Amino acid sequence: MEMTGLNPETDRIIEVAMIITDSDLNVLAQSEVYAIHQSDDLLDNMDEWNTATHGRTGLTQRVRESSHTEAEVEQKLLDFMSEWIPGRATPMCGNSIHQDRRFMVKYMPKLENYFHYRNLDVSTLKELAKRWNPPIAKSVVKRGSHKALDDILESIEEMRHYREHFLISAPKAEAQ
């Protein structure tokens, strides 16, 4: 999810995408990437970082040209999720997703409610690795494209990296 800033009281959602994975992080399905139309006034008043970043990626122009509304995209994503997952059955997963949820509560409440109340936040593992095993944290290479789909794919790769190099797990029990 990309927004015009970090404050859901004054900023808005401008791009969303979604990927469904299984518990082993294999991609099962991928939604369309939606640029959500927002007013020129809102886009013209983004802070310097968002103006530069979303301008560089072309997202600002895509948002200006889009006819998608938040409500329309919310319904499309609900339809997409319901093909794969029953309501309230899966946590939201990604990087710093508490921020995404804050915006969803305000602008896409039905979608936010479709997720389980728990989160699987890759940022938690990143912060733990920084504190407990800094070389592991430094070994993660982030491109930081700030495009919704790219960021999701990068979060999945980051989670795979932490699973392989940071989390210790017992071998799966053999079927008897």
UniProtKB/Swiss-Prot annotation:
Gene Ontology terms: cellular component: cytoplasm
EC code(s) of this entry: 3.1.15.-
Chief localisation class: cytoplasm
Family, similarity comment: Belongs to the oligoribonuclease family.
Function in brief: 3'-to-5' exoribonuclease specific for small oligoribonucleotides.
Gene Ontology biological process terms from the UniProt entry: DNA metabolic process
Gene Ontology molecular-function annotations: 3'-5'-RNA exonuclease activity; nucleic acid binding
Residues the record marks as active site: Y117
Recorded superkingdom: Bacteria
Exonuclease domain boundaries: 2-159
Subcellular location: Cytoplasm
Organism: Neisseria gonorrhoeae (strain ATCC 700825 / FA 1090)
Taxonomic lineage of the native organism: Bacteria, Pseudomonadati, Pseudomonadota, Betaproteobacteria, Neisseriales
Protein name from the UniProt record: Oligoribonuclease
InterPro entries, per the entry: Exonuclease_RNaseT/DNA_pol3, Oligoribonuclease, RNaseH-like_sf, RNaseH_sf
Pfam families assigned to the protein according to its UniProt record, in alphabetical order: RNase_T
Enzyme class: hydrolase
Keywords for the protein's UniProt record, in alphabetical order: Cytoplasm, Exonuclease, Hydrolase, Nuclease
Presence of keyword Nuclease: yes
